[in-house]
Amino acid sequence: LKIFHNAMYDVLWIRRLGLTVHGTIVDTMTVSSLVNENRFRYDLNSVAKEYTGLGKNESALNMAAKEWGVDPKAEMYKLPAMYVGEYAEKDAEITLALWQELKKEINMQDLHTIVTLEQQVFPCLVDMKWKGVRVSEDQVDVLEKKLQATYDLCIKRIKAATGISPEIWAAKSIAKVCDKLGVKYDRTEKTGAPSFTKNSFARSKNLVVKSIATARQMDKLKNTFLHSIRNFVYNGRIHSDIHQLRGDQGGTVTGRLSYSHPNLQQLPNYSPIGMGIRSIFIPEEGCQWGCFDYSQQEPRLVIHYAMNTPGVTGLGEIVAQYEKGDADFHQIVADIADLERREAKTINLGLFYGMGQAKLQAQLGIDDTDTAQALLKQYHSAVPFVKQLIKSVMDRAQRKGRIRTLGGRYCRFDMWEPKQFGMHKPLTFEQAETEIGIGNMKRAFTYKALNKLIQGSAADMTKQAMINLHKEGIVPMIQLHDELDISVENEKQSNKIIEIMKDAIPLDIPNKV
């Protein structure tokens, strides 16, 4: 075993020196996140103090850095080894001691399967970071001009219709445009200030309001995404930071990967503008860019779990459709419940993500509460298994304080709140016991239980696919939601990638890529 804390940083620096780390790599930062994904801090000092009582003494390092006029962390490499050596030795000592304690937690919590999965995916992530993604800077220039031209045209239309050149990110400025047009808009409950969300723009049928939404999109893509890409290009490639799990620099509690510097997961979908943005990324020489995504990964996971939950009803027709071959979950639900596909998809995903009725109503664009309630009643009558599964997973989270994903990852519910309905500040068990009382408290956030189960299981499946691909010498360029983008050599390799991804973690219904 080779034991690190924040292994990605160390392993990449070692590789930069021309050396290779062989054997199984253990990252105590990753393991500490698997042991408890809800910690506030994951730095070595914080985690080690909790589990070992040991901590760093950085006084000598800070003193030396002050004398040399450098930042003790960011510019440590500028200090002579005599000043850094003792600090590094202590780091190694603490990391080893931490690993000895974390091994006990792995055994107590039965985390061997998920720890192994995260250890096995790590070499793939290192290669992804090291290799980077090729970027066409010429295409970035072309896109910036196109986005600016579209933005200018939108502002011109708005001014022609209202005489106002709006500040598109200022709600008060947009409100003036709407007032001039006689268009109603939402206001915040607390202050009554104008409120404009993505959903409110999507609901509007006014062409001028839609121009504001388009201008916002163009501005964000140009000044946030493309600007960020340009800043991080090095020798024609970008080498984003990849966050394997929750940590101090980013990451998710469900196990899904995240990116920073830049955040490649801000890539738009496959709309025309999205395809334009994606065109800045180019494959290796002689290859084609391949996008391999799990078809409706989350709905398939919902059906898989529903099939394995006692007492769940109304699955027959949907399972039959999947077993016949390709199936569109949202369309099947729409047909069964006599809804439009858009309505069915909005309700499906809203319930999977733990949305309440008020938010779902807003997503559906329905102003009348009675109408929204009737629509949801119609949905639940036709497809009762969704509500039944949500309740089953919530009950398990409430009863056990945690749920477990396909790959053995725990999602924990360690905060507490009063049993009575209302808005409450989540508390630790000790705080809740004192302020609320044992008989009057329940676990908080269990309404998110199904979402965490789905997201965590999707992460397990995608990471297992990446492990299996890496064993075949295939290194993904980008991992994005339920998609792997890969530089593909030929059709034979493309078919191989599809089969590897489909078979990564079998479900009780057919998977599709």
Language-model segments: which ranges?
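Glycine- and acidic
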Residues: 28-29, 76-84, 133-141, 280-289, ...
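Helix N-cap motif at beta-to-alpha junctions
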Residues: 489-493
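Conserved RNase H-like, two-metal-ion catalytic cores of nucleic-acid enzymes
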Residues: 1-46, 50, 148, 303, ...
